[in-house]
Amino acid sequence: LMCIRVSPKWGLWTFGLEVERVRYEATQSGIGPRMHQLRNLYKDKRIIVGCDKLDVVRGVIQKLQAFYELLLHYPRWRNNVVLIQITIPAMHSSPKLERQVSELVSLINGDFGSLSFTPVQHYHQLIEREEYYALLSVADLALVTSVRDGMNTMSMEYVVCQNEHGQSPIIISEFTGTAVHLQAAIQINPWDIGGVAAAIHHSLCISDQERYDRNKQCHEQVVSKTSHTWALSLVQQLQHRLRHRFSAHSTPIFNLEPMLKGL
């Protein structure tokens, strides 16, 4: 339309994490005391962590449904596991979604809780960075159940924190861009509620060796594809295309006028 001749080319460059920044923030002096507080607060409990925007595509509903199924069909985890779910207010709030989440939290706590223990700790708010990194570091499992998502930075931050502290596994939805990035994570279909519950049970029961192997592979992927390597690879590709453009030889447009005159 603009009479510009182009040779378009597309590519896939996986966006990464600022690993050194996360590692630095996760090892600050204030993190240790927060971790100690969490361990004392949930002594003898396995901690599952979730941190999502309160948005339909983030799968918070599916996560809570799967946690209910876990406690229903795997009774060994009743009074032995806690889900700490942070839901960050979205830009456009949804009263209906907020109500659904609150109802599910109340259902789980009503059916499986007691006067001395509440299985779902739900915080609909932003939390301080120290609390956030302490939670990622002390958790026994991270749970990402998005039904559609791009690069989920929380999952990568969890991998970095766990490499420094616990080497605990992560469950991640196959419908996130991060699933391609973290091949060694335990991947699930968030719509398969029973399957997610089974994956949670498996993740809480895996051997120390499997925990170590999965975390090691995930950590290698995270540190090898950082935001810096993403920017570098993109710039290198642009430079390559520019060099190719200036060295290319274009075929001139065929001139029909001399041919027509000879007819």
Residue spans of the language-model regions?
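Nucleotide-sugar donor-binding and catalytic loop/hinge architecture
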Residues: M2-K9, R23-I48, P75-R78
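Nucleotide-activated donor-binding/catalytic signature segment of Leloir-type glycosyltransferases, i.e.
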Residues: T87-E130
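A conserved mid-protein helix/loop that constitutes part of the nucleotide-sugar donor-binding site
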Residues: D55-E69
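Conserved donor-binding/catalytic core segment of Leloir-type glycosyltransferases
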Residues: Y42-V57, I84
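Catalytic binding pocket for nucleotide-activated donors in carbohydrate/polymer assembly enzymes
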Residues: L71-I84, S137, L141-S224, T229, ...
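Short hydrophobic/charged patches on amphipathic alpha-helices used for structural packing
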Residues: H36-R39, Y133, H219
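C-terminal amphipathic helix plus adjacent low-complexity
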Residues: I4-G16, T87-P89, S116, S207-L263
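Short acidic alpha-helix that forms the nucleotide-activated donor recognition element
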Residues: E128-A139
